[in-house]
Amino acid sequence: MHCKILGLPVQEGTGRKGCNMGPDSYRAAGIADAIRELGHECTDLGNLAPAAQRPLQHPNHAIKALPYAVAWIEAISEAAYRESAEGFPIFLGGDHLLAAGTVPGIARRAAEKGRKQFVLWLDAHTDFHTLETTTSGNLHGTPVAYYTGQKGFEGYFPKLAAPIDPHNVCMLGIRSVDPAEREAVKKTEVIVYDMRLIDEHGVAALLRRFLERVKAEDGLLHVSLDVDFLDPSIAPAVGTTVPGGATFREAHLIMEMLHDSGLVTSLDLVELNPFLDERGRTAAVMVDLMASLLGRSVMDRPTISY
């Protein structure tokens, strides 16, 4: 398989600086070597730059860096569309705003192929705010609402060529949801498996249910993995830590199941903030998880000291 890694040094979607260093942190953690050691071809496409900014102002004055955020979304969407034509694109973040570009880009490509696009959202948060409902103004909390075609983005974010059907989005590991997001998600068919459901039923049963549906509908699956999906005890390098996240074992099980399914066609690695890391610990964990998704099994995975 030909893996293509593209750095998306976005930090305008979050209230803390540092995510722009994420792509190079993954490189320093050996992401390309990890891919090649599994027998895959790896091409590093470097880091993307945002499109030209244009003046934009929204009535919600809490919103931060709207022109710059939109410039990033435009550039990322085109890049994701281009790189999803062939091979396996891996998008290195950068904060989760980048998914407002990656998902629309790959969904546009899927629509041209006549295939349904599915998204597995591995995150502590639903990221289902609109420009009108966000109170923090941090636009990394808006991608899912945007790419599923919710109202409130018209005239600001780019028009979607192929909105994702909300029922084709599965959120796994959710444990922090704002009231406005909760009400908005309840009005859709987005599949939400929060940590209580994981505790009650186990992550394998819940994930298997979603993967069976993706397979039955001959879908393409994009995985968007946020550092804060993981418990901060194993992945501290994120500005939005929420206790009670996925364990190292749960996360690897998910990645191995995804590999076994053969359904995953693209991947986001997001919200890594090296400024908050401990000697590269989180970057190493994320690279290790990616390797499991690409085929590294327990029997041949080298032991790494984090």
UniProtKB/Swiss-Prot annotation:
The record's listing under SUPFAM superfamilies reads: Arginase/deacetylase (SSF52768)
Keyword Manganese listed? yes
- Pathway membership: Nitrogen metabolism; urea cycle; L-ornithine and urea from L-arginine: step 1/1
Which Gene Ontology MF annotations are present? arginase activity; manganese ion binding
Question: Which cofactors?
Answer: Mn(2+)
Record organism: Brucella melitensis biotype 1 (strain ATCC 23456 / CCUG 17765 / NCTC 10094 / 16M)
The cross-references to Gene3D superfamilies, in alphabetical order and at most eight, read: Ureohydrolase domain
The record lists Mn(2+) 1 as bound by 96, 123, 127, 226
For substrate, which residues are the binding ones? 125-129, 136-138, 178, 240, 271
Q: Which domain of life is it from?
A: Bacteria
Q: Which family does it belong to?
A: Belongs to the arginase family.
Which reaction does this chain catalyze?
L-arginine + H2O = urea + L-ornithine
Q: Which GO terms describe its cellular component?
A: cytoplasm
Q: What InterPro entries does UniProt report for this protein, alphabetically?
A: Arginase, Ureohydrolase, Ureohydrolase_dom_sf, Ureohydrolase_Mn_BS
One Gene Ontology BP term is:
urea cycle
Q: Has keyword Manganese?
A: yes
| E.C. designation(s) | 3.5.3.1
Q: What class of enzyme is it?
A: hydrolase
Q: Which UniProt keywords apply?
A: Arginine metabolism, Hydrolase, Manganese, Metal-binding
Record note on cofactor: Binds 2 manganese ions per subunit.
Name the positions where Mn(2+) 2 binds. Answer: 123, 125, 226, 228
What is the recorded name of this protein? Arginase
One Pfam family name is Arginase
